[in-house]
Regions:
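Transmembrane-helix signature of multi-pass solute transporters
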Residues: 95-102, 184-191, 218, 243-247, ...
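Interfacial helix-cap and linker-helix signal at transmembrane-aqueous boundaries
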Residues: 48-49, 79-80, 164-172, 226, ...
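Helix-loop-helix hairpins in multi-pass membrane proteins, especially solute transporters
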Residues: 73-210, 392
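12-transmembrane solute porter fold
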Residues: 20-43, 56-64, 74, 94, ...
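Glycine/proline-centered helix-kink
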Residues: 39, 128-131, 149, 154-166, ...
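Intrinsic disorder in cytosolic terminal tails and internal cytosolic loops
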Residues: 1-19, 201, 444-454
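Structural signature of transmembrane alpha-helices in multi-pass secondary transporters
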Residues: 31-34, 62-65, 69, 96, ...
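Hydrophobic transmembrane-helix bundles of small-molecule transporters
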Residues: 170-276, 283, 431-432, 448
Length: 454
């Protein structure tokens, strides 16, 4: 046991050999397929909206998934401790696969959006649960060596999504963008069922029933307030979001099991991580949603080429992330995340100019590479920085909370930019301005020196 009362010895599920390797493969597959679904739809959406109609609801296919994933992340972490990893994993996988199958059978864009909510809830439950299972499978010393596998799996799922989505649209049907998840997910679930043994359940874990409900409802009202339509209804939704948000703050101060402990809310690193998570998600998912549409509508590109357009950003993310930790150690979040978001803002600004003046595909690819080079260190150290400051027994909840802010930032920004649909230069400029504001804020408020592992 460490000083926080958390065991750092291997639990019964962390046995070496074939079973552990099989369980590792299962959670890696689950992580890939849930990350894959976040970007695979990007190259398929122009085709989907042409076939099903409802182009004015284009952004909701993304926002519904990301918002539901946020809710899934918020409720799954403690449930995995209370009920066991397997029940939460299988429930999440079940929702994800049922949602995927129904999305593949959808006959209207409204049905597709509803089924994307199911998908998102499942994906949101899967991603933190897979990371929790990986902590069960490996001792503390071993985890450092295998962490790259899980980071790489998430990155690979996001990177290949647009390419595979474009290929499926051109050579099969857009419906296979969703249906392809079913056999892969079933195989991952079978592998985990056969190879993984749950550690003892923790009956001492307290659940916050009202926190996720208030947070989810408030965010949903804010999302609805961004939908074009009746001004009175939008203002009513915005008012509801503010009231429910205030209720959430009051409830969390009184809760015995808050979503994020109050002592962490006051930590500058955590607050900086929240800002970085929201901005990182906003940039990543708004580009994933709107760049392929721009490429198909104004660039005349095929779905495969439109999907490939995102590859420089994702590769830039991977390259930039390798420098992020070095910057974090040298100058803290103020340097790593602040400089990262400044570079990302530059890339988004160049992309806006490319869209405005028609500089061509190569200029767009270069702009997205610059954006990714900045976004990689900014987003990764916005998570690693707060993790390094948090006590060991709070790191799980810090990780899931910051991951939820990334999804929430993505869902709200994709929906907000839909108000400027068709004005791609303006959309990219707004995203760049957001990154620039966050860069300035982090340069002033973020911790200015490296933190040591707790």
């Amino acid at each position: 046991m460490d000083g926080s009362g958390v065991s750092v010895e291997p639990v019964p599920s962390a046995r070496p050999g074939v079973a552990r390797r099989t369980a590792t493969g299962a959670v890696l597959l689950a992580l890939v397929v849930s990350a894959f679904e976040g970007t695979v739809v990007t190259s398929a959406m122009p085709t989907i909206t042409r076939e099903l109609g409802g182009q004015h609801l284009y952004s909701w296919v993304f926002s519904a998934f990301l918002f539901a994933s946020t809710v899934g992340v918020l409720i799954s972490g403690k449930l995995a401790d209370r009920l066991g990893r397997k029940p939460v994993f299988f429930a999440g996988m079940g929702l994800f696969l049922v949602g995927s199958a129904l999305c593949g059978l959808a006959d209207s864009v409204h049905a597709l959006i509803a089924f994307r909510v199911l998908q998102g809830l499942g994906a949101g439950a899967l991603q933190p649960t897979t990371l929790t299972i990986s902590a069960d499978l490996y001792t503390l010393r071993e985890r450092a060596a295998v962490q790259g596998l899980f980071t790489g799996a998430w990155g690979a799922g996001n990177a290949v999504g647009p390419l595979i989505g474009g290929w499926l649209v051109m050579h099969a049907s857009w419906r296979w963008v969703f249906l392809v998840n079913v056999p892969v997910g079933l195989f991952a679930a079978l592998l985990l069922y056969l190879s993984y043994r749950d550690p003892p359940r923790r009956t001492d874990v307290k659940l916050d029933r009202w926190g996720p409900l208030l947070a989810g409802t408030s965010a949903a009202m804010l999302l609805f307030s961004l939908e074009p339509g009746h001004a009175e209804l939008r203002w009513l939704c915005l008012l509801g979001a503010v009231v429910l948000g205030a209720g959430l703050v009051f409830q969390q101060r009184k809760s015995h099991a808050p979503l994020l402990p109050m002592e962490l809310v006051k930590d500058r690193a955590v607050l900086s991580g929240v800002a970085g998570g929201i901005a990182g998600g906003a940039l990543l998912y708004s580009m994933a949603a709107w760049v392929p549409l721009w490429m198909t509508e104004q660039g005349g590109q095929t779905p495969i080429v439109a999907g490939l357009t995102l590859l420089p950003m994702l590769l830039g993310w991977s390259v930039g992330s390798t420098f992020g930790v070095k910057l974090l150690v040298r100058g803290g979040m103020r340097l790593s995340a602040g400089v990262g978001f400044a570079v990302a803002a530059t890339g988004a600004g160049l992309l806006a100019l490319t869209a405005a003046y028609g500089w061509g595909t190569y200029a767009a690819l270069a702009s997205l590479a610059v954006l990714g080079m900045g976004l990689g260190p900014a987003a990764s150290t916005s998570l690693i920085g707060p993790q390094s400051r948090a006590p060991w027994h709070h790191r799980g909840i810090v990780t899931s909370s910051l991951y939820a802010t990334r999804l929430l930032g993505g869902s709200l920004t994709v929906a907000a930019l839909a108000l400027a649909r068709g004005h791609f230069a303006l959309q990219f400029a707004i995203a760049g301005a957001l990154a620039g504001v966050v860069a300035l804020g982090l340069a002033v408020a973020a911790p200015g020196k490296a933190t040591s592992e707790a």
